[in-house]
């Protein structure tokens, strides 16, 4: 009798259990369907890098909201749900990108192409990604740096180094977990389009790394700048370093702690001709701050959708006014932005015009896209073959 009761209760519970939600779902024609169970919600919207637009979702009789988007181009997309004003991850999707501060984590989905894309793993020799803890004397707490070593690293020596900086919404893992920098370089090296190189990916925020201990941080200068003057003030602050054109606290960490550690512990060259620095968005502003202060250290510079403005000459006038010397310092000054980037795009265009005004030799690229990883993966794929020539 007891067994019969248990069986009846079990059957009843199964009958009452809601059907599992499938999300995300990518169809063969590259349409993306997202679903989110929220029977009591009044409004649910899908947001993110999908196609630049928020997508209101429709509620079904089962309390599951859904929307179908596309067809989308083959790529890696981030998204989240806005549920009555609150951001939420896709609970059915374990593929998540870490975020920082108000940007928060987001869900990730890849829409496949007809074959492997330039950022996908292919049957080629692969390098390694190492997570290296270190004590930052410049900042006063523990941090980690992610380091890519190319295939065959153990048998080589004096590799060139690319210092690759992330944006405000990411941490040091960003260029690997969502940017696929390691796979992009594996593929380029296998195709003999890029030289084998070490890539150093530091934490761009002046905080203790999430995985090294309790939260510690310097005062958030960007938040203070935004409170005073909005986005323009933030861009100027990132580009100007200490506010006067000197090195920022992050830059001091990179140059005084990370760079010496890398050159002591890894098989890398110490020649400026074998160093490059590149960054996206916030990292682009940091790249300018470092490159203009220490042009003797890096012969290759690349800025992707950089947090910069045309007001750079207010703080770097001495450097910019001597174009002949500046042009001798850099073998490459590369500058790129997405055509539809409304966040840093206006400042980027002003900055490019300022470089031209002062006669600074540079390569300017405008690519399809907005302020998003779709653009930055393409940028890295284009930049890497230009380095260390």
Predicted regions, residues:
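Boundary at the C-terminal end of the N-terminal hydrophobic targeting segment
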Residues: 13-15
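Non-catalytic cap/lid and distal C-terminal segments of serine-dependent acyl enzymes
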Residues: 26-54, 59-389
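Short amphipathic beta-strand starts and helix->beta connectors
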Residues: 17-20, 51-52
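Short beta-strand segments of immunoglobulin-like
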Residues: 21-25
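Bacterial N-terminal signal peptides
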Residues: 1-10
């Amino acid at each position: 009798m007891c067994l019969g009761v248990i069986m009846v209760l079990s059957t009843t519970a199964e009958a009452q259990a809601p059907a599992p939600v499938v999300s995300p779902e990518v169809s063969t024609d590259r349409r993306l369907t997202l679903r989110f169970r929220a029977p009591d919600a009044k409004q649910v919207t899908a947001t993110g890098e999908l196609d630049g637009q928020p997508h209101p979702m429709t509620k079904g009789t089962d309390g599951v909201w859904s929307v179908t988007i596309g067809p989308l181009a083959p790529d890696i997309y981030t998204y989240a749900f806005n549920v009555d004003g609150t951001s939420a991850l896709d609970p059915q999707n374990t593929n998540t990108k870490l975020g920082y501060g108000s940007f928060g984590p987001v869900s990730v989905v890849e829409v496949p192409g007809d074959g492997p894309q330039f950022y996908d793993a292919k049957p080629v020799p692969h390098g390694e990604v190492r997570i290296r803890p270190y004590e930052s004397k410049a900042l006063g707490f523990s941090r980690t740096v992610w380091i890519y070593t190319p295939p065959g690293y153990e048998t080589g020596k004096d590799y060139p180094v690319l210092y690759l900086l992330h944006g405000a919404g990411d941490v040091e893992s960003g260029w690997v977990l969502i940017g696929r920098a390691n796979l992009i370089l594996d593929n380029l090296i296998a195709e003999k389009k890029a030289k084998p190189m070490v890539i150093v990916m530091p934490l761009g925020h002046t905080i203790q790394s999430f995985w090294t201990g309790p939260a510690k941080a310097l005062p958030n200068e960007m938040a203070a700048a935004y409170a005073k003057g909005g986005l323009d003030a933030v861009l100027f602050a990132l580009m100007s370093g200490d506010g006067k054109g000197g090195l920022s606290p992050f830059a001091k960490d990179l140059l005084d702690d990370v760079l010496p550690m890398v050159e002591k512990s890894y098989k890398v060259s110490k020649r400026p001709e074998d160093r490059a620095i590149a960054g996206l968005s916030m990292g682009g502003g940091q790249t300018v701050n470092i490159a203009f202060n220490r042009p003797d250290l890096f012969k290759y510079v690349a800025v992707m959708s950089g947090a910069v403005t045309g007001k750079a000459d207010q703080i770097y006038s001495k450097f910019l006014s001597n174009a002949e010397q500046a042009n001798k310092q850099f073998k490459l000054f590369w500058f790129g932005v997405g055509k539809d980037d409304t966040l840093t795009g206006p400042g980027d265009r002003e900055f490019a015009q300022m470089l031209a005004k002062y006669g600074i030799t540079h390569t300017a690229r405008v690519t399809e896209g907005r302020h998003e990883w779709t653009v930055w993966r393409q940028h890295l794929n284009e930049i890497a073959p230009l380095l260390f020539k």
